[in-house]
Amino acid sequence: MDPAASSCMRSLQPPAPVWGCLRNPHSEGNGASGLPHYPPTPFSFHXXPDFPATATAAYPDFSASCLAATPHSLPQEEHIFTEQHPAFPQSPNWHFPVSXARRRPNSGPAGGSKEMGTSSLGLVDTTGGPGEDYGVLGSTANXXEKKSSRRRKESSDNQENRGKPEGSSKARKERTAFTKEQLRELEAEFAHHNYLTRLRRYEIAVNLDLSERQVKVWFQNRRMKWKRVKGGQPVSPNGQDPEDGDSTASPSSE
């Protein structure tokens, strides 16, 4: 071990540490005014690390006791010194009240949190713009889809409406396919009577395996054809007017 360090360990009262000189620039003035230095703590309370000889050689002004002093003991020593010497001038930048010391560290994060909150709100506001744009685009897309679906429905309805008259016209244009025997019997009956009674129409329909409506429609068409061929409104073969004959022969046929 270095002889300087060993002598420091043996001495019970080492010289005043340099921390007071460093902390107080008016150390010389204090000596002149008669204020004694605060009592140093014995070296036995602190650990004795082995310092190389180069440290003492490089810093001859520093004693071994100053090098051996640990930082965690400094606040206690300062507290003891301030209690023993209350008249010693203290700088406001060095010591703060406990309440102010507790509030100041919290004020920073609080202000930071407020700033963070405002910044986060700003971020939300700034990011809200694209979200609104996307919402507008989505609404326009939905409106376009609805319009297209409506157009499709309207077109389908129009096609159905167009198809319905065609179907009805086709149904109307459907004609009964009469056989040769049926046509022969109908022509023979028309040669005798242009208008049929209801009972005679029923008999012909049963004999020819037709409906009364089919027989009635055939006679109507046959009369129109006969009128076109002869021209004008002819007299019935029986010498009766067609209106009168139809009304007298079959009052309930129509």
UniProtKB/Swiss-Prot annotation:
Amino acid composition bias (Basic and acidic residues), ranges on this chain: 154-178
Function of the molecule: Mesodermal transcription factor that plays a key role in somitogenesis and is specifically required for sclerotome development. Required for maintenance of the sclerotome polarity and formation of the cranio-cervical joints. Binds specifically to the promoter of target genes and regulates their expression. Activates expression of NKX3-2 in the sclerotome. Activates expression of CDKN1A and CDKN2A in endothelial cells, acting as a regulator of vascular cell proliferation. While it activates CDKN1A in a DNA-dependent manner, it activates CDKN2A in a DNA-independent manner.
Record keywords, A-Z: Activator, Cytoplasm, Developmental protein, DNA-binding, Homeobox, Nucleus, Repressor, Transcription, Transcription regulation
Originating species: Pan troglodytes
Residue ranges of DNA binding: 171-230
SUPFAM superfamilies, per the entry: Homeodomain-like
Protein name per Swiss-Prot or TrEMBL: Homeobox protein MOX-1
InterPro entries: HD, HD_metazoa, Homeobox_CS, Homeodomain-like_sf, MOX-1/MOX-2
Taxonomic lineage: Eukaryota, Metazoa, Chordata, Craniata, Vertebrata
